[in-house]
Amino acid sequence: MYFAVIGAHVRGKSASPAMHTASFKALGINAVYIAVDVPKEELGCFAQIARLNFRGFNVTIPHKEEVVKFLDALSAEARAIGAVNTVLVERNLMVGYNTDAHAVYKLAGGHMEGAEVLILGAGGAARAALFAAIKAGAKKIYVKNRTAERAEALAREFREKFERPIEAIPWSGAVKADVVINATPIHDAVIADLTGASLYVEFVYTPTPRTKMVEEAERLGVKVVDGVDLLVEQGAQAEKIWLGVEPDRAVMKKAVLEFLGL
C-alpha cells in the first residue's frame, strides 16, 4: 500500500513520512509513505495518479482548499469546513476528510466551550480550527489574518453557515481571548496577546515546535498544545480512516521528535 503527504516544499521537511512509517511498522502493516512536492498546476495530475496507485494521502499547505475540486466525495465535516487534509482512496474513488478539525477539537475542545477564541489565519488550517471552535461551543470567535479581506470573507462565510458570533479583526488589532490558535505558518514572531489566555494551540512544528508564540505562552504560564501534538493526533485519525486501526500515538510522537532532532 502506498500513502503520501502532498504540498509545497514538503520533501525532507515534513515529519509525516517518519511518523507514519514508524506507526505502520509497529502495527505490522506493509506500507510505504512518502512526501511529494506538488505545484498547484499539477494537483489534478497527482489526483489521477493517486486514484490508481495510492490507498490514501495527506494534504498540507497550500492545497487543503484547492484539492476539494478533484475529489469524488467529502465527509460531512470536510464539506462544512471547506478544506481537506486527509484523503481515502477506495475502489478508485477519492473521499476527503478533515482530521485537523478532529485534532483541534479533541485536544482543545474542553477549553473552548463557552470561551472566546482567537484564530490566527484564514486558510485551510484556520477553517478546521474555526469548525472545531464552533463544535466545542465557543461563546465568540475572532479571526485575524494578514490579508484582511480573507479574514472577513471567512468570518462572514462561517457566521452565515453556522449562525454563530464570528468577527474578523485587523492584523494589527488587539483582542484578548481565552484560547488562541495559530493556524498560520508564522513561527518566528509573537503575533497575538496571550495575556489572560488559558490555552495556546500551535499548528507549526517545523523547524521547531518551540515557536516564538509557544515560548511566549510558556513565559506567561499558558497551557500549550504544540504542533507535534496536533500532527500526531490528526495523523492517528488519518490512519484510522485509511486502515481502520487505532495507532500508538507514543510511537508516532517519538518518530516525529527524532525527525526534528529533539
Swiss-Prot record:
Shikimate binds at residues 14-16, 60, 85, 100, 205. SUPFAM superfamilies: Aminoacid dehydrogenase-like, N-terminal domain, NAD(P)-binding Rossmann-fold domains. NADP(+) binds at residues 121-125, 145-150, 203, 227. This is Shikimate dehydrogenase (NADP(+)). One of its GO terms (molecular function) is NADP binding. Its EC number is 1.1.1.25. CDD domains: NAD_bind_Shikimate_DH. The active site is at 64 (proton acceptor). Involved in the biosynthesis of the chorismate, which leads to the biosynthesis of aromatic amino acids. Catalyzes the reversible NADPH linked reduction of 3-dehydroshikimate (DHSA) to yield shikimate (SA). The gene is aroE. Pfam families: SDH_C, Shikimate_DH, Shikimate_dh_N. Belongs to the shikimate dehydrogenase family. GO terms for biological process: amino acid biosynthetic process; aromatic amino acid family biosynthetic process; chorismate biosynthetic process; shikimate metabolic process. Pathway: Metabolic intermediate biosynthesis; chorismate biosynthesis; chorismate from D-erythrose 4-phosphate and phosphoenolpyruvate: step 4/7. It catalyses: shikimate + NADP(+) = 3-dehydroshikimate + NADPH + H(+). It is an enzyme of class 1 (oxidoreductase). Coiled coil: none annotated. Homodimer. It comes from the Archaea. The keyword Amino-acid biosynthesis applies. Keywords: Amino-acid biosynthesis, Aromatic amino acid biosynthesis, NADP, Oxidoreductase.
